[in-house]
């Protein structure tokens, strides 16, 4: 049986909160969540500093059922890397999928997200749904 460390549990909770905050366009929660030196690499290749990312959040497309799964958390003392698969449904019913990698640093006893890299997958219809 695998036992999660306290740090891993805390980071897993933060990861869940991060996904919920993005889905809700909750700038206030993200503001508290990100380190002052947070940077993001977005699916289009743009590189945004913290303030620019937070300014973008209200304009993100509204999606349904945003969720994360297939989470891997690796903790290295006061640094951690989180890999997560995300999925959602656009308003037109089109499913979306992607992955993100977030980097956390423990500063003054608190885990903060210092970097995010998001990749989205193009939608590929399943040729034979009976194989699922």
What are the residue ranges of the model-derived segments?
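A beta-strand edge to alpha-helix "cap/lid" segment located at domain peripheries
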Residues: 2-32, 37-132
């Amino acid at each position: 049986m695998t036992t999660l460390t306290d740090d891993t549990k805390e980071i897993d909770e933060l990861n869940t909160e991060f996904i919920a905050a993005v889905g809700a366009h909750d700038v206030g929660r993200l503001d508290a969540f990100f380190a002052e030196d947070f940077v993001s690499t977005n699916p289009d290749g743009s590189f945004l500093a913290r303030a620019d990312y937070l300014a973008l959040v209200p304009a993100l497309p509204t999606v349904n059922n945003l969720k994360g799964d297939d989470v891997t958390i690796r903790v290295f003392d006061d640094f951690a890397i989180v890999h997560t698969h995300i999925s959602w449904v656009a308003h037109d019913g089109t499913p979306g999928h992607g992955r993100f990698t977030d980097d956390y640093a423990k500063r003054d006893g608190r885990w903060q997200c210092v970097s995010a890299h998001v990749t989205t997958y193009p939608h590929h219809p399943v040729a034979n749904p009976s194989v699922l």
